[in-house]
């Protein structure tokens, strides 16, 4: 589903059967195929309030999510519909329709609370749908929001400063939209026109008083204002006054509905398509379809085990899976690019190392892009080990290819020489000179052959070594030479052989140096890209912390302006803690990153020193190649 899913109808994502929540594997399989970022819109509200109609409209259909034309609630659990996003390229719009809250047919009301909490955790835009007006009763019916502190955790362990875990909800909670259906009031306050958003904000103002009833009424208002910094309201007229049309609204054309209702619905959909955010987790981790599936499974498993869904734990679970996939993705990219770009044998080792460096640099970037929360760089080290092994394979293939190619060329060039030796053509007076001239022509022709690769000298050296006994025999049997001339020829041959061995050793030492420089370059590239990623993560964390502080300060100031001084003072501890967090993030930047990079540098040094075996391969491992590809001379 890289280019967008093709779901013709919604499927159940989370089943709610016999008071037990269960993730539907069919839905997970659909999400697994969506690697695009997702915009997730969830709608929640009392049953029979028309939630499904709005979701169908967002999907561009007038049917799909079951509407139900009776007082019986149709939707059970959470249903999902994935459609290509109409205005965000390469994004998928995931619509989540939840079963109606407060259904009298349901047994355990706790399931309503879990459905509500799951919708908050999974979506990036949370739509609360109610009827008629936002009044005291409507807010009381939204008591589920007050239970979120008991049903969701940001951190896996309590904070040492004693500040409530829920203070961090604002960093990952969705945008909050309140849709009011069959709205009949005038949008006015104290005789003055107001906007829909102003209507909502006025309804969320706290009521003065200390009695339990007032406090109970204020609690959902307070929670909405504290947990959801971005809020918006949409009101809708009644779709039609015709009861028959209402009962079959999924079969009714838009033209048969009230024009004002049509306009309001289109405005709502346009806002969702334009402003609904891509789903992210803390510190800017983008959620794709497959990641959303993992989150759903993780949260439901936590609920069924009797635990509370925890964002931190969910991110850790997600990171383990995603980082393993990132290692594989980056390593596969490296292999594919090397196979495409490198033509074996390379003329020099440096040519291969340069290509390796380029492909590795791009592969590291891919790993960085798709990994997160890589504690102690565990997965980056796995990626490095994998890449080093793959690099070693390419080095061996390059050497083997060079050996094969050079041997084939030498076989071709020395064919006449070998035939002359077999025929005894050099076993005559003056035969040694003739033999040497023939061998020199072979050497000249051999070095004219292009792109012989890294084993060119070594293969030719072995050829010369294979000829030493033959040359000695021809030399000693040549009656045209004096003993002194023969002795001089022997000395010259030994000297030339020693010089060629020195050249070969020099090449191997140079290649060792190139290998070590390449490893150092690899280490530095890994550290540089990690440093850039850590700095970006730190900047995102700082922005997140500043956002939490500013929102908390706004809420605190609002309490003061509305006359709730005690609530204002109660938030001082939270604000002080946010300021300390920001100071720590700002001031501990360099030491923290430096420590992480130092640790990685040590680990990479250990990893990269292991392929010393590969470096040494050029010195002591080549004999195995010659055993596999024996020379015929």
From Swiss-Prot:
Source organism phylogeny: Eukaryota, Metazoa, Chordata, Craniata, Vertebrata
Any GO BP annotation: defense response to protozoan
The record's account of how the chain is modified after translation: (Microbial infection) Ubiquitinated by S.flexneri IpaH9.8, leading to its degradation by the proteasome, thereby preventing its ability to promote host defense against bacterial infection.
SUPFAM superfamilies according to UniProt: Interferon-induced guanylate-binding protein 1 (GBP1), C-terminal domain, P-loop containing nucleoside triphosphate hydrolases
Segments forming domain GB1/RHD3-type G: 35-277
One GO cellular component term noted in the UniProt record for this chain: extracellular exosome
Protein's recorded name: Guanylate-binding protein 6
Similarity remark: Belongs to the TRAFAC class dynamin-like GTPase superfamily. GB1/RHD3 GTPase family. GB1 subfamily.
Catalytic activity: GTP + H2O = GDP + phosphate + H(+)
């Amino acid at each position: 589903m890289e280019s967008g899913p093709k779901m013709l109808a919604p499927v159940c994502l989370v089943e709610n059967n016999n008071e037990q929540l269960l993730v539907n594997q069919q839905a997970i399989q659909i999400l697994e195929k969506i690697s695009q970022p997702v915009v997730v819109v969830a709608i929640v509200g009392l049953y029979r309030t028309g939630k499904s109609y709005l979701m169908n409209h967002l999907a561009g259909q007038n049917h799909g999510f079951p509407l139900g034309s009776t007082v019986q609630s149709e939707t059970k659990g959470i249903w999902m519909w994935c459609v290509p996003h109409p205005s965000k390229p390469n994004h998928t719009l995931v619509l989540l329709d939840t079963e109606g809250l407060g259904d009298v047919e349901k047994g355990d009301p706790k399931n309503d609370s879990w459905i509500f909490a799951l919708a908050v955790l999974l979506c990036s835009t949370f739509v609360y749908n109610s009827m008629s007006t936002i009044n005291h009763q409507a807010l009381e019916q939204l008591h589920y929001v007050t239970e979120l502190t008991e049903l969701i955790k940001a951190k896996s362990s309590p904070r040492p400063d004693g500040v409530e875990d829920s203070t961090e909800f604002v960093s990952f909670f969705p945008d909050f939209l309140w849709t009011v259906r069959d709205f009949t009031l005038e949008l006015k306050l104290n005789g003055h026109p107001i906007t829909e958003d102003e209507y909502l904000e006025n309804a969320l103002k706290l009521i003065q008083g200390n009695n339990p009833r007032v406090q109970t009424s204020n609690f959902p208002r307070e929670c909405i204002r504290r947990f959801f910094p971005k809020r918006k309201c949409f009101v809708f007229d009644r779709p039609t006054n015709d009861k028959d049309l209402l009962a079959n609204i999924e079969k009714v054309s838009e033209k048969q509905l009230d024009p004002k209702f049509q306009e309001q619905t289109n405005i709502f959909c346009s806002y969702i398509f334009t402003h609904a955010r891509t789903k992210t987790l803390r510190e800017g981790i983008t959620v794709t379809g497959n990641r959303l599936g993992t989150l759903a499974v993780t949260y439901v498993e936590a609920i069924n085990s009797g635990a509370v869904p925890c964002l931190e734990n969910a991110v850790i679970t997600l990171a383990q899976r995603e980082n393993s996939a990132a290692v594989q993705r980056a390593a596969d990219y490296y292999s594919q690019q090397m196979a495409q770009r490198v033509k074996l044998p390379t003329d020099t080792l440096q040519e291969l190392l340069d290509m390796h460096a380029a492909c590795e640099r791009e592969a590291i970037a891919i790993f960085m892009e798709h990994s997160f929360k890589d504690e102690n760089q565990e997965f980056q080290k796995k990626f490095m080990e994998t890449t080093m092994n793959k690099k070693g394979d390419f080095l061996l293939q390059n050497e083997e290819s060079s050996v094969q190619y050079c041997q084939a060329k030498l076989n071709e060039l020395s064919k006449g020489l070998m035939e002359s030796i077999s025929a005894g053509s050099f076993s005559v007076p003056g035969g040694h000179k003739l033999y040497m001239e023939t061998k020199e022509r072979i050497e000249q022709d051999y070095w004219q052959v292009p792109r012989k690769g890294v084993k060119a000298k070594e293969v030719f050296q072995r050829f010369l070594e294979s000829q030493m006994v033959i040359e000695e025999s021809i030399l000693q049997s040549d009656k045209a030479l004096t003993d002194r001339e023969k002795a001089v020829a022997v000395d010259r041959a030994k000297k030339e052989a020693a010089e060629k061995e020195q050249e070969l050793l020099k090449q191997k030492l140079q290649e060792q140096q190139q290998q070590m420089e390449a490893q150092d370059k690899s280490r530095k590239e890994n550290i540089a890209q990690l440093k850039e990623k850590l700095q970006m993560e730190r900047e995102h964390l700082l922005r997140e912390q500043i956002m939490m502080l500013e929102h908390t300060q706004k809420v605190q100031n609002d309490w003061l302006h509305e006359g709730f001084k005690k609530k204002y003072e109660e938030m001082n501890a939270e604000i002080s803690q946010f300021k300390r967090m920001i100071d720590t993030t700002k001031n501990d930047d360099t030491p923290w990153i430096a420590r992480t990079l130092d640790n990685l540098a040590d680990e990479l040094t250990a990893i990269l020193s292991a392929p010393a075996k590969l470096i040494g391969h050029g010195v002591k491992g080549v004999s195995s190649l010659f055993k596999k590809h024996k020379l015929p001379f």
